[in-house]
Amino acid sequence: LKISRGGSKKNDPRKSSEKVSMIIEAKAPTRVDLAGSTLDIWPLYLFHPGAATVNVAISRYAYCTIETHARGDERIDLVSRDIKRKESFASFAAMERAARYKLPLLAEIAKFFRPAGGFTLTTDSEAPAGAGIGGSSAMAVAICAALDRFTGAGKSKEDWIHISRDAEAIVINVPTGTQDHYPPAFGGAAAIELPPGGEHRVELRVDLNELEKRLVVCYTGKPRQHGINNWEVFKAHIDGKGRVRHGLERISQVAQQLRGALEGADWKSAGALMREEWSFRKRNLPTISTRMIDRAIAGARRNGALAGKVCGAGGGGCVVLLIDPDARERVERAIGEAGAEVLPIKIDRQGVQVVSR
């Protein structure tokens, strides 16, 4: 799927007697989280004043295409290319009545927007399975953008973020946060501040070209249980486990300090803070790491990486490394020798894009 800027937000197949078919395409970037994740899950951030997450949108994309059916054809087809799964319903009402779904994220978001008329909704993803780079969240934001264009709902990006968060919680049956959804919606590098009353995004005052030179992302394999690590930390915190609460407090403080180091282009301090964040995260939940993750980070560190940490809930998936730009070739070779796969990435500057024709 290829998207370029263009299209009109006024196209609505439900209101046009001339258009019987429309194609809407949306794409949204994934992200790497540099510090502070897990804290974005309500109400954890309320217990840690000043809590924030720091993340960067990257050029591994999730895609959503909607193709409307001819007038009178009420059938709804949901298709996922990346996991090779599809399902169909005779109508929207039939989809609402279904007891379970093969593609629950697609169905739950479609149910929120309540589109009129039949359509085929197709998704695809460049994120490897269980990568921990927010692939499902990017997918959800892309679906929201496409369905918003299709229905003329006129929702904001912040609305898409909260619809996506809630749909994911319904699907995985555990609490979810919002830090995974802001990079797909807005792109760039940002701090997601988490005060009482609701989160908000603040763009980092950082040279994105310079930061881009200093990031490496690698994939260490699919985790055994997606999303469970965050739930275990969440539950331990709510249950009053002092060690976990203290660990998240330090992670919160480190995230605030890392934001300052990045904005000051103090890369040495940024590396030290990322190492500290990763250390506290492993203490909170040792299963967040694996032997391959440890090997990849250790090998990269010996060859010029300043720091490395797992992305997302961990237990496998991706690792993000902060490096000296001159050491890139050595770091990438060390990652390969550890058995991991380097994923070429750039920083996405635009966030979700949607076009229709």
Regions found by a protein language model. Name each.
Residues 115-122:
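Conserved catalytic cysteine-centered active-site region
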Residues 316-318:
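Glycine-rich active-site/cofactor-binding loop and its immediate structural neighborhood
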Residues 2-3, 10-11, 15-19:
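Polybasic, lysine-rich low-complexity intrinsically disordered segments
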Residues 127-131, 306:
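Short pre-catalytic strand/loop immediately N-terminal to key active-site residues, enriched for Gly-Thr
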Residues 133-157:
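DPxDG-like acidic metal-binding loop motif
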Residues 103, 137-141, 176:
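Short alpha-helical patches at coil-to-helix transitions and adjacent helical residues
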Residues 18-35, 39-42, 46-47, 55-58, ...:
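C-terminal nucleotide
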